Structures are given as C-alpha cells and as structure tokens.
UniProtKB/Swiss-Prot annotation:
Keyword Chloroplast annotated: yes
Membrane topology: Peripheral membrane protein
Reported function: Essential for the assembly of the photosystem I (PSI) complex. May act as a chaperone-like factor to guide the assembly of the PSI subunits.
PANTHER family: CELLULOSE SYNTHASE OPERON PROTEIN C, TPR REPEAT-CONTAINING PROTEIN MJ0263
Entry's Gene Ontology cellular component terms: chloroplast thylakoid membrane
Protein family per UniProt: Belongs to the Ycf3 family.
Chain's gene name: ycf3
Subcellular location: Plastid, Chloroplast thylakoid membrane
GO BP: any one term: photosystem I assembly
Name of the protein this chain belongs to: Photosystem I assembly protein Ycf3
Organism the protein comes from: Triticum aestivum
The organism's place on the tree of life at top rank: Eukaryota
Length: 170
C-alpha cells in the first residue's frame, strides 16, 4: 500500500485524495503517474524524518520521471536529505544536478551557499583563514544567484553580503 494512503493526518489525507483525483483526470502516462506517486511518498516520508524511505522513493521516482523540470525537484529533495544528514559533498552534487535541469531554483543556490558558508566557518575554527575566505567567496556567488532570481528573499544573506562587502545592492 503506498505510504500516502496510510498517513493519519487529515491535511495529508486530503492532499492525497486531491492528488489522486488529479492523477486520474490529467492526461499523463502511467510512468509519469507512478513517478509522481513515488515523489509524493518521498516528500511525505521526508517530512516525517524517514530519510531512508524518502530516498528510496525519490530514486524510484528518478528512474521513472523523464521531465527535466520534475527531475530537478526530485534531485533538489535528495540534496535536502543529504544536507540534513551532514553529507554536504553529496548534497552539493544533487543541488548542482537539480540546477542543470532547472537553473531557476533559488532555494538550491541558497542551500549551496549555506553549505559553503558553513565550511568557511569550519575553516576559521581550524585556523585556515585563506580556505575560509575561498568558501565565503563561493557562498557569496551562490547567494548572489539566489537573490538575482528572487530579489525580495534571502534578507539575511543580503545583509551578510553587505557587511562583508561582497556585494552592493541598489
């Protein structure tokens, strides 16, 4: 039984019912429908902190999904799980792959910037200011891309860029 049918939350049940109705009436292939079901189940498992189950669902969705735009969101969510697990190198890889398919994902740029900023802070703690600056510069580049896509968002990043003189805003 798909995961989405067993969740007890009223909102999740309602969302699942609506999604199932849409899957029946929207003209899509059976493969696309299966991919969406795995994606939806992956999101549900991820929201509950069941990362291993979420990854299994996302990998199955990736196997079935052919649309690059839809694949970008699957890859992005896989990146989120690796970020949550502290697997930053893997997370960056998945964010890059998501952006290759959909360059308009500001949240992927933001998450990449956060990882780079974190690595910069870790380099400072290890006494390597040169490496730290390189990580901070990379974080700045990713934040600039995220901000360019959604200028009203990422206010903390904008403030950090101003304070560190890495970017001037108009």
């Amino acid at each position: 039984m798909p995961r989405s049918r067993v969740n007890g939350n009223f909102i999740d049940k309602t969302s699942s019912i609506v999604a199932n109705i849409l899957l029946r009436i929207i003209p899509t292939t059976s493969g696309e429908k299966k991919a969406f079901t795995y994606y939806r189940d992956g999101m549900l498992a991820q929201s509950e902190g069941n990362y291993a189950e979420a990854l299994q669902n996302y990998y199955e969705a990736m196997r079935l999904e052919i649309d690059p735009y839809d694949r970008s969101y699957i890859l992005y969510n896989i990146g989120l799980i690796h970020t949550s697990n502290g697997e930053h190198t893997k997370a960056l890889e998945y964010y890059f792959r998501a952006l290759e398919r959909n360059p308009f994902l500001p949240q992927a740029f933001n998450n990449m910037a956060v990882i780079c900023h974190y690595r910069g802070e870790q380099a400072i703690l290890q006494g390597d200011s040169e490496i730290a600056e390189a990580w901070f510069d990379q974080a700045a580049e990713y934040w600039k891309q995220a901000i360019a896509l959604t200028p009203g968002n990422y206010i903390e990043a904008q403030n950090w860029l101003k304070i560190t003189k890495r970017f001037e805003f108009e």
